[in-house]
Regions:
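C-terminal region of N-terminal signal peptides and the immediate post-cleavage residues
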Residues: 27-42
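N-terminal export and membrane-targeting signals
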Residues: 2-20
Length: 288
């Protein structure tokens, strides 16, 4: 079935997402279904083919009746737009603010919508007190504590967490420069995932990035190699999120290959963002 998707953006990253099965049996994207609801909404259409359909939600819009009506009618998965990012949840060391995200989680629970946690470790929207840390032991303690406190607060309420977000450099198989990479080295991603699994064994743990749709791209290969290595060594990773930013030509011709190859590693593949720039109705329909 074809339907257009429009994702509203604010600040650096707002996530709307669809879980897709690269190969229906391989991807294993589970979903909320509502058998009493006709397949006339985005969420119901997705459910009919074993998928879910979600959107980014800012807490500030939950008081808008029109917005909420569309949200609750069309979507069965919710991602907080910015409310779970580090600069909001821990603006100063050890002082946590979960109020805005709590509003979104409460809404989702009241309306039978799953929640995606976004995001625990990211180089952007990071408070200056974190980005200025130069001691490895201090940063490791800070990172592990942040993951532990936030995941503990929402334990049992989050379907999947973006544990680490956008850690790879554009056009490269290597990690980007960040306080985590520069101070802790390559092992920070593994440590973040191991810490996360220890806090909430039931939540799916995801790595999320953009420009990893083209199978031949260096960045795609870098992420693939990391996931393959993690799976071979028992590092807990359950899913890979693809921030799918396409032009009028739609996705790369080998996008299906990319999804299939990641799914073959034993991880869910999820479209965590989807936008199609400068495209007409036909291009939207063909892509979606």
């Amino acid at each position: 079935m074809n339907y257009p998707i429009r994702i509203v953006r604010r600040r650096k990253l707002a996530v709307g997402f669809v879980a897709v099965a690269a190969l229906a049996a391989a991807a294993g994207a589970t979903l909320l279904s509502n058998t009493a609801q006709a397949a006339s909404t985005l969420g119901a259409q997705a459910a009919a083919s074993g998928r879910y359909f979600g959107t980014a939600v800012p807490a500030s819009k939950l008081g808008d009746g029109t917005y909420v009506s569309i949200l609750d009618r069309e979507f069965n998965m919710i991602t907080p737009e910015n409310e779970m990012k580090w600069d909001t949840t821990e603006p100063s060391r050890g002082n946590f603010n979960f109020g805005p995200a709590d509003q979104i989680v409460s809404h989702a629970q009241a309306h039978g919508q799953r929640m995606r946690g976004h995001t625990l470790v990211w180089h952007s929207q990071l408070p200056s007190w974190v980005s200025s840390i130069t001691d490895a032991n201090t940063l490791r303690s800070v990172m592990d504590n942040h993951i532990t406190q936030e995941m503990t607060h929402y334990k049992g309420k989050i379907y999947a967490w973006d544990v680490v977000n956008e850690a790879f450099a554009d056009g490269s198989t290597q990690h980007r420069s960040s306080v985590f990479q520069n101070v802790l080295g390559n092992g920070f991603i593994e440590e973040a995932f191991r810490t996360a699994r220890g806090v909430d064994p039931a939540a799916k743990l995801c790595y999320n990035d953009y420009n990893i749709e083209d199978w031949n791209a260096a960045k795609t290969q870098g992420v693939y190699s990391m996931v393959k290595d993690f799976k071979s060594r028992g590092v807990p990773i359950d899913c890979v999120g693809f921030q799918s930013h396409f032009g009028s030509g739609g996705p790369p011709s080998n996008f299906q290959t990319t999804l299939s190859n990641f799914a073959a590693l034993g991880v869910d593949v999820q479209l965590t963002e989807l936008d199609i720039a400068q495209a007409g109705t036909t291009q939207y329909s063909n892509t979606v």
